[in-house]
């Protein structure tokens, strides 16, 4: 049912002939066009709908791939940066969370649900750079909120002061007069010195 609704949504947003819609973009260059076509060829058996390609226009019709439980499909091995949507099936939410957590932490987590309990369950268990519930990309809109990844998805945060802090290195500098030394820092480490150090470390 989800796949059918997605197919209907494509037609609703872009019309029956998506290729003629001026609002639907094209692939950035030939290299990426070839890369995406190769992925579609490798995963052809999973094609639910779409996938029509025009190399001259660098156009690919939005494609939905029904992978079932095949996590090793070509479309699951890299970021796609193209109109290809691989869909994996799961029975329990725990299975989906386990799948995500076995991989590098995502730059963004998009969760679609009407259940607050599902929101809480996922957000408490999945680490990601940012989160959108029932939407995508909108967490980038507010310039006062940080944008960044976790681990492999990126280090540091951006937007406003967060960008300034990311590109600023706070360096500790300690100055001591050249002719001033604390005897307690140097041997011999007598019992008296040890007691003094313990006193200051309490």
What are these regions (language model features)?
Residues 11, 59-202:
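Conserved C-terminal structural/oligomerization subdomain of aldehyde/semialdehyde dehydrogenase
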